[in-house]
Design a protein with these regions (language model features):
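Conserved tyrosine-mediated DNA breakage-rejoining catalytic core shared by Y-recombinases
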Residues: 8, 20, 32, 41-72, ...
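Basic, Lys/Arg- and aromatic-enriched nucleic-acid-binding interface segment
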Residues: 4-32, 36
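Short, polar N-cap/turn motifs at the start of nucleic acid-interacting alpha helices
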Residues: 45-49, 134-154
Length: 176
């Protein structure tokens, strides 16, 4: 089952219920559009306002930027080897730990969508689409090869609204 887009209030609820470390991981993912695995592989030497990341999934390089408040939080959190150290400081925090915490937080608030860390990447894409209205800019920001894949992300809010309208229509309630 694919992960789904979250409304801003749902993002805020999920973030509020995460552990401090996982909240910082997800704030970073939300601001940069990076996949959680790439966020977890950040090393302290990379923490600058703009830096390059090689994406684990694709092997492609991309530049990301961080605003000062987030950059400061990341620097304060960073260990010697990793920005997000694991129990063994020579290894980074795990994707599985973040995934479980995001799932737990979403369930605690009874959020009906299939929420996972990747949902935050869709939120990032939708926000970029709203800001720029340019699918090519969103495609480049996500480092996608295909515009059609980017459209799935960038229009995820509209897909969610349509899903709710269909659900309301089938239950006999008036769609708004």
């Amino acid at each position: 089952m694919k992960t789904e887009y979250l409304l801003q209030r749902e993002v805020d609820l999920v973030l509020s219920a995460l552990t401090e470390t996982n909240r910082l991981v997800m704030r970073t993912a939300l601001h940069t559009g990076l996949r959680v695995g790439d966020v977890l592989q950040l090393q302290p030497w990379q923490l600058r306002p703009h830096f390059w990341v090689t994406e684990d999934k694709t092997g492609k390089r991309r530049q990301v930027g961080l605003p000062e408040p987030l950059l400061s939080d990341l620097r304060n959190h960073a260990g010697e080897y990793w920005v997000f150290p694991g129990r063994n400081p020579r290894k980074h925090h795990t994707r599985q730990a973040v995934w479980k915490d995001v799932k737990r937080a979403a369930a605690a608030f009874r959020i009906p969508q299939n929420v996972a860390p990747h949902s935050f990447r869709k939120v990032y894409a939708v926000e970029l689409m709203k800001k720029y209205g340019d699918i090519e800019k969103v495609r480049r920001a996500l480092n996608h090869n295909s515009e059609s894949v980017t459209l799935i992300y960038a229009l995820a809010d509209q897909q969610l609204q349509a899903k709710y309208r269909r659900r309301r229509a089938s239950s006999g309630r008036k769609a708004s």
